[in-house]
C-alpha cells in the first residue's frame, strides 16, 4: 500500500490510496501480488497509464521480481446522454480549419478571451487530443485540474485564466511524448473532458477543434448541440481548398451546423515600424472571395504581426491588449459572434412559433 501511495491519479492531488481507488481485495502470496483498482468509469482514458504506474511503483519500492496482477473495477454515476450534456451552456462555437498551421488555435484562444472581456461567461475546450496547444497559449502548462464532488459525481474542475474556463488533454499527458491512441480512446477522452467536467453556467463554449475532418469532429457533432462553426483559413489557395471541405462537412445534411463565417488569418504582413503598410505575402483577399462564393460572412481579417506569435508563445494572447490592431480585430470578431449567435437563437424561436 505504501508503494501505491506514491502514485497520483491524473486530475487529482490525491494518490491511489487516498482516492480509495485500491480495492480491499489485496492479496500477497510470496512474490505474487494481486488487487483491483477502482476507476470512476469504464472508459477512463487514464486507466492504462495508471495501471502501468502502479506496477512500476511496486517494482521500484518492493522488488522488480514481484509478479503483479491488477484487475479493473468501475463504479460511477452514468454520464448524461449525448445531446443532454452541458445544459448550462447557451452557445457552443466550433472553431475549425481544413488545414493545420493556419492559426486556428490562435483564433480560438483570442476569441474566447475577447468574449470574456466583453463580460460573458466563457469556456474553452482544446479538443485536439493529439496536438494540444492551449496550455502553452494560456501560460498554464504546469497547472493540473483537480476533481470536485458534485451532484453525486466526481467532476474535473477546469483551469481558469483570463476569465476563461479551460480544459485540454495537455494537462494530463506528458508534453514531450507523442499521444499514441486509437480513435476510440481519443473520443472517450474527449467525452470525459466534456461530460465529466464542472463547466457550470456558460454564455459561450468555444471548441478548438483539430485541423481537417476526423473522428474527433464526429464525436463533437454527436455529443453536443453546436450553435455554429467558425472556419479559419489563410488566403492561400491550398488552404482555401481545405476550408471548403470544412464548410461542406458542417453543411452536410446529416450534420447541419450553421456556418457563422470565415476568418482570414495571416491576411497581410504589417511590420511594427510601418503599421500603415500591408504586404500580401500569402495572397490577397482569398477568404473574402471564398466567403462570397460560399455565401457566408467574412468575420475578420487578422494580419501577420510579430506580437501575435510572441504573445501566444509567452502565454499572453493578443486579445489581452485591445489597444493594438490585432487586439481590436479579435474584439470585433467576438462582437460578431455575439450578433450571429443571437440571430441563430432568434431564428430557432421563430421556427418554434
Task: Describe the residue ranges of each PLM region.
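Residue-level signature of catalytic and energy-coupling elements of molecular machines
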Residues: 4, 22, 89, 100, ...
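Conserved catalytic-core segment of NTP-binding enzymes
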Residues: 52, 203-204, 210-310
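Walker A/P-loop phosphate-binding motif and the immediately C-terminal alpha-helix
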Residues: 92-128, 262
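Short glycine/serine/threonine-rich phosphate/pyrophosphate-binding segments
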Residues: 101-110, 132-133, 209-217, 240-242
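Phosphate-binding loop that captures ATP/GTP phosphates
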Residues: 115-176
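Switch II (G3) loop of P-loop NTPases
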Residues: 144-149, 169-185, 191-219
